[in-house]
Amino acid sequence: MKRAIGFTLSLLLLSTIIAQPLQAVDKEPRKILSGWIPYYSVKTVLPLVRKLPSASPNVEGQPSVCDASQYGPVENQAIESSYLFTNKDLMKEVMPFWYSLKSPTVIRDNYVSGNPSWPIADTVCLMRRAGLQVIPTMTDGTAKLVLSEYLANPATRTTIVKTIVDLVMKNNFDGIDLDYEGFAFVDGNATWSKTAPRWVALIKELSVALHAKNKLLSVSTPYVYDPKEKQKGYFVYAWADIASSIDRLRIMTYDYSVARPGPMGPLAWTEKTIKYAISVMSPSKVYVGLPGYGRDWITSVQGKCPISAPPGLIGGAKAATFKMNYAAAKAAIDGAIPTFNEQYSEATYNYTQNYNGLTATGASTACTVNRTVWYQNARSYADRIALVAKYRLGGAAMWTLGMEEIAATNEIRTAALAIAPDPVVNTISLENVTDGFVNYGSLFTVKGLITLKDKTPIAGLNVTLEIKRPNETTWAKIADLVTAADGTVTTPMTLGGAASVRLTTGGTWERAASVSTEEEILVKSLLQVDRPVSALKTLPITIKAQLLPKLAGKTANLQKNVNGKWQNIGTSSISDANGVFTFITSEPKRGVVTMRIQVVDDIASPIFAIVIR
């Protein structure tokens, strides 16, 4: 009967999952999923596709272009059907697992060696095309205790900070994620009390440097418990001391059992470390770790295995790992029926392997290998995502994206819809902007209206005015605003060059983040003419014009009104590095001449007159 009930429940859950996309929902799912993308498995989440021969080439120091026009139909279909694009509604950021700190001035780029024919600029560009922030992870690539000693020296620590910030800025990443596990698993716990303050000093200094450039700081660490308790966890990471400096804490709530058979990350153990984390920092910073893999241990071996058997068949050998999306097939191959452990919220089973054959001396022999398997499945994920809802966490972090079974992804989406925030409608408008143009230096007004979907205005909401100039890929904040009682914001603005502007609001547990449409504004040039009021006939007359914005290499002509028509006089002038045109002319007769300066394919100056004496 238990088996029949379980089967019925599975059918009900499956029908719910299948029906979910058909339901009309007013809300978008809460973006609670993040995860790592190792350099060796980028193709798991993004296709390795080539751009068209006519595509814009990548230029050093310039952002890559990867919109649909850069690829053929087949390639675009592959992109849009990839893991990142089909699950982008659940994610706001990803952590490419690509970098390793080797010394204070050297960061090893594993992506390039792992993907030599797949430009990093194109990969990052496609992640941004999916609407994702890119916060790459950097591991500790130094030997035992080396990084701790680096951090003990303030000058060396500052050098490391500069090296990290330079990497972020060069690649225009949205921040950095530090995964320095050497402290925990290499250096030894006897060093933690000495290393902890050094780590804290690094985080505080790096935080200031990154935040000054509007970048994020994330850290990924093993579990930590309240230091007042007997069991403290990996206290070297000093969560309480770094809480105010970091933007994300991704807890590696997995690898509970490594050397010996057991659960990947028991539910109670996971919840305990979460409760400590949110006691020292905002829950919105905390992300629970989800393992996309399981382990298979050898528990014992009876008999002597033949030489034809796989090597390493001994009790206590290092466990084999497998992806969650292979777990069902593996269980079938192993001839086992997994059971779900309610206490740990994980799947497990035992199985045996029998090997018959010959010894090295040719004698007949046989052995039986007993094995135990543990892994998390869709139900495990549902239980852990429930902790996100219970404690209003920032979300979950998966090692690694794309390793989970489809049912697990569906559980995340179902949960994300159940806790979806109210959508916010963000509308931007511009005043004193004509057909997308403003005059150089002229004042115009940016207005916004922020409401709920039912048009109820949202008062007292923080709104950010952001700008993006041509050839830039990221938005920069230029003003902080607060909505009035009617949900509006208003601010004056001037521009010295073409740019796009938008309004954004941050998300809360109750309300979704919002982004207005992007308004492109082009700036009409301005010519400021420096010329004499009068001049003597036949003598040289010098006329200068300042082009604003200052552009070098533009061509302009000095023109004179002759019988109602504008005629070029003299030779054309090319603007110098400061955007200045210089003309030298003369007039043979006394009188009044009417002139202007015409920039080729652009504006003309105001008309001016010179009295010739």
Report residues per predicted region.
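Beta-strand-rich domain onsets/edges
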Residues: P310-P311, P421-D454, E520-T542, L547-K550
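Short flexible loop/turn segments that cap and initiate beta-strands
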Residues: L452-K477, P549-T571
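Substrate-binding surface in catalytic domains of secreted glycosidases
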Residues: P104-W118, A184-A332
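Conserved, mostly hydrophobic/aromatic
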Residues: V94, L178, L206, L249, ...
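Glycan-binding loop/region signatures in secreted carbohydrate-active enzymes
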Residues: L46-Q62, G292-L387, T414-I419
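Enriched for extracellular/lumenal, surface-exposed ectodomains of secreted and cell-surface proteins
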Residues: L495-T517, K589-I607
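Glycan-recognition patch characteristic of GH18 chitinases/ENGases
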Residues: V25-I164
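Glycine-centered loop-to-beta-strand initiation motif
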Residues: G448, K477-M493, S575-I584
